[in-house]
């Protein structure tokens, strides 16, 4: 039997792909929750799609755990991980601390999010976790090394 999806959580939401997914999921009858470091710019999208927004820094384990705990009444059965952290510039001039923070968001945050999602999906034997990527994952572009590393 194919189980129907009910609640989509998009972590790392912004005006591009995430906004399109919010509209798509909502138009197909799913409850939608958007999580991002800042949600002020997402208010119009939430109103349009009937979505809920929650502030969450995906590189912070406590934030991610609290995000999922706040959704336990109706846990998400679709989780999309779509954050972005970019430090642009020539490779030899990049600040190592900024690059590390970018990897914390793109890679480590993905681990944290997937771990919390799986904890809830396994008992239900149902769910989907999707990680977005970019062409940078297979071809880094000039002045975009940290972005490419995080999308690999």
Show which residues each predicted segment covers.
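Active-site loop of short-chain dehydrogenase/reductase
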Residues: 6, 75-77, 121-133
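Rossmann-fold scaffold of SDR-type NAD(P)-dependent oxidoreductases
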Residues: 11, 76-84, 106, 131
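Conserved glycine-rich cofactor-binding loop
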Residues: 14-15
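Conserved glycine-rich Rossmann-like NAD(P)H-binding loop of the short-chain dehydrogenase/reductase
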Residues: 30-42
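Rossmann-fold cofactor-recognition segment
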Residues: 48-62
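Catalytic Tyr-X3-Lys loop
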Residues: 85, 92-111, 130
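A short, exposed helix-loop element centered on a Lys and neighboring polar residues
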Residues: 114-115
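Catalytic loop of short-chain dehydrogenase/reductase
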Residues: 128-152
């Amino acid at each position: 039997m194919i189980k129907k999806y009910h609640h989509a959580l998009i972590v790392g939401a912004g005006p591009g792909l995430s906004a399109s997914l919010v509209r798509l999921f909502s138009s197909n009858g799913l409850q939608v929750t958007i999580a991002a470091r800042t949600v002020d710019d997402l208010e119009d999208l939430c109103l349009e799609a009937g979505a809920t927004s929650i502030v969450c820094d995906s590189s912070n384990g406590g934030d991610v755990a609290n995000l999922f705990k706040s959704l336990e009444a109706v846990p998400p059965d679709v989780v999309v991980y779509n954050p972005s952290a970019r430090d642009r510039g020539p490779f030899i001039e990049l600040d190592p601390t900024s690059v590390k923070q970018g990897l914390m968001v793109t890679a480590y945050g993905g681990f944290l999010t997937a771990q919390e999602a799986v904890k809830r999906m396994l008992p239900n034997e149902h769910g989907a976790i999707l990680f977005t990527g970019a062409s940078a994952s297979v071809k880094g572009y000039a002045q975009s090394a940290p972005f490419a590393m995080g999308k690999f």
